[in-house]
């Protein structure tokens, strides 16, 4: 039972990463196209590079947080930066405030618009419902966040696979055509890597909401296992979305 609980925590934190990373721009393909597909056939490998970059960073941060028992981002930054903390901890505060203004706004707007489309209720009412749901989940702490993240992740993954996989199988010829066109256009690898780097770096700000989950790990090395699983999940789902976009990328309509 203890071993089962340990691995459920490891998987739960991995799902927290996925649900934090996942959003309207991810599901619709807007972000994937902007940062990956538009740079040619390299889009088949650059999502993996970005996620490995994130996984290494997050694994170290969670390992550090668990080892030094610093579970809020201010304490974590103070321990990490040492004598430079007065500068970099305060800079991170500014960054975190900016991210927290933008990211929830996107979540509320996307969730509210989707719920409004599905239910026919006014957009503002749906946005309020999304906000109340997020608030309730947040106030009950990290255990509930992990449970909700696990349930949402499974629903999201199943939903994406149901939508994308049949389309990918049915349009395999279009994917081959798109890949051939991309290959012949000879998009530079450097630009593709730089775009993946930008995407991955933007995601690093999420560490502020991750370090609190390090408290649940039995030992620091569990962070490496958790982020390894999260990396695989994110790579698979990003690749699925990339292939889904490639089915229509060569069709101007």
Residue locations for each model-derived region?
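Transmembrane-helix boundary/entry motifs in multi-pass membrane transporters
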Residues: 2-9, 38-44, 67-99, 117-123
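Hydrophobic alpha-helical segments and their helix-loop junctions in multi-pass secondary transporters
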Residues: 24, 97, 134, 138, ...
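Structural signature of hydrophobic alpha-helical transmembrane segments
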Residues: 117-130, 192-202
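Hydrophobic, membrane-embedded alpha-helices of multi-pass small-molecule transporters
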Residues: 7-27, 46, 96-100, 167-171, ...
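Membrane-interface loop-to-helix entry segments
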Residues: 111-113, 122-130, 137-168
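Extracellular/periplasmic helix-exit of transmembrane alpha-helices
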Residues: 58-63, 170-176, 195-198, 230-253
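Small-residue-rich segments of transmembrane alpha-helices in multi-pass membrane proteins
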Residues: 16, 43-47, 79-92, 152-168, ...
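Juxtamembrane transmembrane-helix boundary signature
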Residues: 17, 48-74
